[in-house]
Amino acid sequence: MRQLYLDCDGVLADFDKGATAILGLAPRAFEERHGLGRFWQKLAQAPDFYFDLPLMPDAMLLFEAVRHLNPIILTGLPRGNWAADQKVRWAAEHFPGTRIITTMARDKRNHAKEGDVLVDDQERHRPLWEEVGGVFVHHRNAATSLDELAQYFPISAG
């Protein structure tokens, strides 16, 4: 039986909104102006950055439609050891009882079996996931992801 995995940042958690509040600029603009090192340094210094992220506007719509499939949250970590606990607590707060796996983004594929489905907003993760026989759904919003997921799973109308 195929497993459904949901990425966290950009699918369930609004990383960009949370990062903008800390950085004072949109994440890409801050990174271009100050560099990737300073970007992550500022976020790492923010108390409970990941735990405090708001939900994406349509996160609950997506999750409720797939809850019966027992999805697993599969989320990438930045370098360092500061983010995993925050992400685990965030998932427990917003999606109690849902399993979460924290890993380096490049290692997400190590959790896939052939046919498993990953919903992720970062298209750059597609090749590694598909290389192991997984199905990649590029998340733009809940409606389009649910339409695509309906090819692989029975989707709840809510």
Task: Show the residue positions of the predicted features.
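Active-site neighborhood of HAD-like aspartate-dependent phosphohydrolases
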Residues: M1-A44
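Short, acidic loop-to-helix structural element flanking the phosphoryl-transfer center
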Residues: E31, Q45-I73, G80-D85
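Short, structured coil segments at secondary-structure junctions
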Residues: R67, P96, E131-G133
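Hydrophobic anchor at the start of a short beta-strand
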Residues: N70-I72, T98, F136
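Substrate-recognition "cap/lid" segment bordering the active-site pocket of phosphatases
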Residues: L74-V117, E123-P127
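Short amphipathic alpha-helix with an adjacent loop that forms part of the alpha/beta core around
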Residues: R109-A112, E148-A157
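Acidic, Mg2+-coordinating phosphoryl-transfer loop and its flanking beta/alpha structural elements
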Residues: V117-A150
